[in-house]
Curated annotation (Swiss-Prot):
EC number from the UniProt entry: 6.3.2.-
PANTHER family: GH3 DOMAIN-CONTAINING PROTEIN (PTHR31901), INDOLE-3-ACETIC ACID-AMIDO SYNTHETASE GH3.2-RELATED (PTHR31901:SF7)
Keywords: Ligase
Cleavable signal peptide: none
Factors inducing expression: By auxin.
Name the UniProt record assigns to this protein: Indole-3-acetic acid-amido synthetase GH3.4
Entry function: Catalyzes the synthesis of indole-3-acetic acid (IAA)-amino acid conjugates, providing a mechanism for the plant to cope with the presence of excess auxin. Strongly reactive with Glu, Gln, Trp, Asp, Ala, Leu, Phe, Gly, Tyr, Met, Ile and Val. Little or no product formation with His, Ser, Thr, Arg, Lys, or Cys. Also active on pyruvic and butyric acid analogs of IAA, PAA and the synthetic auxin naphthaleneacetic acid (NAA). The two chlorinated synthetic auxin herbicides 2,4-D and 3,6-dichloro-o-anisic acid (dicamba) cannot be used as substrates.
Family the entry assigns: Belongs to the IAA-amido conjugating enzyme family.
Pfam family, one: GH3_C
Tree of life domain: Eukaryota
A GO term, aspect molecular function: indole-3-acetic acid amido synthetase activity
Top EC class, one word: ligase
Gene that produces this protein: GH3.4
Length: 597
């Protein structure tokens, strides 16, 4: 089903509202001539920010054309901007990157020197994000009509935030949105089953309990389930498995559990949970007490049409478990966005997860694309980047953006493949995040992070004369929550030495966690979205077998390198068949919401 064909027919459907028709027409108009829109966007960004320190360094002298911009302004990564961002963070209010005041920083899931990256934001950015967000339901209603007749059970949470030394908030993009006046004053009750008081509660346990309880009370109104990440939705199912008895008790008695002590939630829930519902309680007990939870989502929420969850890139690993619990419901990956900017949406949301493509909206930012066949360790030729309208189907590119808030030719790190066009606007499949080895949810651990963690932890073995001679890893998403698994092959100075004790190995697990970046540690400590890190010790010679296996599959013996992350089933089976002991982190690593500025 195509958006444009429905519009050309004069009416998307008899139930399509005037607002939805307007949104669909906007999509058609903005994608017809993206190059013209891009030229206008860049001109606006450069003209309004011409007096910034950053642009003055490159002698643009007020030029707003693409040729001058591309020939004079360099392509950069976060480390190139770190000094400028630090100045803003420390309270410098002069026009360093943007002529408009920086109102807050959105924290990226990427890290620099172990700490979250800070992305500058200006007040009007929320309008751009909301513009794109307002297009989602009009598109979805083309494929699943009548969604406005029910509600979405979305598990939404605020995350910890901090304040920079200069007084600016630093927080994730969605936390910023949930705490904005736009969300606080919106009529979310007509859209979500979760009350705002629960979404805004900083205690994730109370928030999850309340959101699940409301979803159960309104089970017949629910027509879609969602979360930001698939791990979040699976965590909610796991929470229900562990708490259905208490939830059923609340419903049976019409009283709220004593574990909920947040005043705002208690006040709000007094109007929602205001009478006993023995019939619903007995139904839940009957369903949840079964050992087999296959299809549990449609059993409890029978009117659910789809799951609203991102399952592209590394998140595709969660698809089998989502299919199991949902009974095979469609999964809609609707939006492509980051803390740097919002990029585009999926105009065919009911497609298979493997076929998801996002249409980039040319009014969001100025987009350039770095062909992904260059030497990643070398410099980037500033003029080699491709315009949005000039990308070629089948080719892969790294996304480079210039934003209204003051990022200029910034490498986002996302690798995208062009799959086609909607009108003249290209559509992209998200392939992966550059240089990321391990990811469970919002965490992103690269090879350097992992190597540092292994080196720090392996020092604990030195006293016993033992060292790590090889290692690899994988992100285990079959457990809830998912967790990092690290395979170690050890070598003792004295071959008669026994393996290190479980106590020592557990300390190694914790030391690895302490060495990983702030995003990982927040996910472990505050968000509880990642489980304890596991080290599996394998037999000596295992990594030689791994090399033999790879060579038998066509790898060159001269070019073979031990993969620092594995995912192929035969390799996983080989490694697991050689495990002699497994050890878990015994406690939580250190983490504080207060960043070092």
């Amino acid at each position: 089903m195509a958006v444009d064909s429905l519009l050309q027919s004069g009416m998307a459907s008899p139930t399509t509202s005037e607002t939805e028709v307007k949104a669909l027409k906007f999509i058609e108009e903005i994608t017809r001539n993206p190059d013209s829109v891009q030229e206008k966007v860049l001109g606006e960004i450069l003209s309004r920010n011409s007096n910034t320190e950053y642009l003055k360094r490159f002698d643009l002298n007020g030029a707003v054309d693409r040729k001058s911009f591309k020939s004079k302004v360099p392509v950069v990564i976060y480390e190139d901007l770190k000094t400028d961002i630090q100045r803003i963070s420390n309270g410098d209010r002069s026009p360093i990157l943007s002529s408009h005041p920086i109102t807050e920083f959105l924290t990226s899931s990427g890290t620099s020197a172990g700490e979250r990256k800070l992305m500058p934001t200006i007040e009007e950015d929320i309008n751009r994000r909301q513009l794109l967000g307002n297009l989602l339901m009009p598109v979805m209603n083309l494929y699943v009509p009548g969604l406005d007749k029910g509600k979405g059970l979305y598990f939404l949470f605020v995350k910890s935030e901090s304040t920079t030394s200069g007084g600016l908030p630093a927080r994730p993009a969605l936390t910023s949105y949930y705490k904005s006046d736009y969300f606080r004053t919106s009529d979310s009750d007509s859209v979500y089953t979760s009350p705002k008081e629960a979404i805004l509660c900083c205690d994730s346990s109370q928030s999850m309990y309340t959101q699940m309880l409301c979803g159960l009370l309104m089970r017949h109104e629910v027509n879609r389930l969602g979360a930001v990440f698939p791990s979040g939705l699976l965590r909610a199912i796991s929470f229900l498995q562990n708490n259905w008895k208490e939830l059923s008790q609340d419903i049976s008695t019409g009283t709220l559990s004593s574990k909920i002590f947040d005043h705002a939630i208690k006040t709000r829930m007094s109007n929602i949970l205001n009478k006993p519902d023995q019939e619903l309680a007995e139904f839940l007990i009957g369903v949840c007490s079964q050992e087999n939870w296959e299809g549990i989502i449609t059993k409890i929420w029978p009117n659910t049409k789809y799951l609203d969850v991102i399952v592209t890139g590394a998140m595709a690993e969660y698809i089998p478990m989502l299919e199991y619990y949902s009974g095979g419901l469609p999964m809609a990956s609707m939006i492509y966005a980051s803390s740097e900017s919002y990029f585009g949406i999926n105009l065919n949301p009911m497609c298979k997860p493997s076929e998801v493509s996002y249409t980039i909206f040319p009014n969001m930012a100025y987009f350039e694309f770095l062909p992904h066949n260059h030497d990643g360790d070398g410099g980037v030729e500033a003029t080699s980047l491709v315009e949005l309208a000039d990308v070629e189907v089948g080719k892969e590119y790294e996304l480079v953006i210039t934003t209204y808030a003051g990022l200029y030719r910034y490498r986002v790190g996302d690798i995208l493949r062009v799959t086609g066009f909607h009108n003249s606007a290209p559509q992209f499949k998200f392939i992966r995040r550059e240089n990321v080895l391990l990811s469970i949810e919002s965490d992103k651990t690269d090879e350097a992070d992992l190597q540092k963690a292994v080196e720090n932890a392996s020092r604990l073995l030195a006293e016993q004369g033992t060292r790590v001679i090889e290692y690899t890893s994988y992100a285990d998403t079959k457990t809830i929550p998912g967790h990092y698994v690290i395979y170690w092959e050890l070598l003792s100075r004295d071959q008669s030495n026994a393996l290190p004790s479980d106590e020592v190995m557990a300390k190694c697990c914790l030391e690895m966690e302490e060495s990983l970046n702030a995003v990982y540690r927040q996910s472990r400590v505050s968000d509880k979205s990642i489980g304890p890190l596991e080290i599996r010790v394998v037999q000596n010679g295992t990594f030689e077998e791994l090399m033999d296996f790879s060579i038998s599959r066509g790898s060159s013996i001269n070019q073979y390198k031990v993969p620092r992350c594995v995912s192929l089933t035969p390799i996983m089976k080989l490694l697991d068949s050689r495990v002699v002991s497994a050890h878990f982190s015994p406690s939580l690593p250190h983490w504080s919401p207060e960043r070092r500025h």
